[in-house]
Amino acid sequence: AGGNTAGRRADAIAGTGGDGGNGGNGGLLSGNAGAGGHGGAGGSSTATTTTGTPPTGATGGNGGNGGAGGTAGFTGSGGIGGNGGAGGTGGNAGVALSVGSTGGLGGNGGSGGLGGGGGSLFGNGGAGGVGATGGNGGSGIGPASVGGNGGKGGVGAAGGLAGQIGNGGSGGSGGAGGNGGTGDTAGNGGNGGAGAVGGNAQLIGNGGNGGGGGNGGTGATPGTGGAGAAGGTGGTLFGAPGTTGADGT
């Protein structure tokens, strides 16, 4: 996870979460591939900014991205993609008499990692990783204060391609947007992340389901929901397509 910041300046940005590592590949003949690691969470801004004209809160750190799942060889399942890390919370700003203080921005959520492909002959594709939630905005304190805007939700990742026989991996869902911070006027909500397409089947098997979009965060202007994604195609000989993910609200 990224480190928190206790800095009181608006440019005291919290640390970014680290990215997850990629999963290992399956054996040349047989064996399942490894899953990708999850992204670390972004740090949060923990101190209230009291200086500046007007005071502005520090920004939360962005979450790290998930690692990709590994690819299978001849037979075996593809690796699952890692999930993104959550965005950090923005810092508070102002004192009781400060005018027009603004809370810090929430960090953006990390994106999911790609699902790995199934074995070339037989094997299911790995599911794509899920996008993470954006961080909430910080609070503004005092007259005419404004809350910080919420961070964006992370984007889901595509599901892996199936082997000649096998099902495609599900696409990852998008993360929700962060909520706007409090103040005399609330901050705006962050937009939800988009879902990702499901993996395709090839000869025999079902397509993976598409990921749904994340919901927008609450705020003076709510965030927009992310778009859901299409499912993967079914096998050319036998198999059904995946379902389409729902749009976020």
Predicted regions and their residues:
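Collagen triple-helix signature
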Residues: 1-248
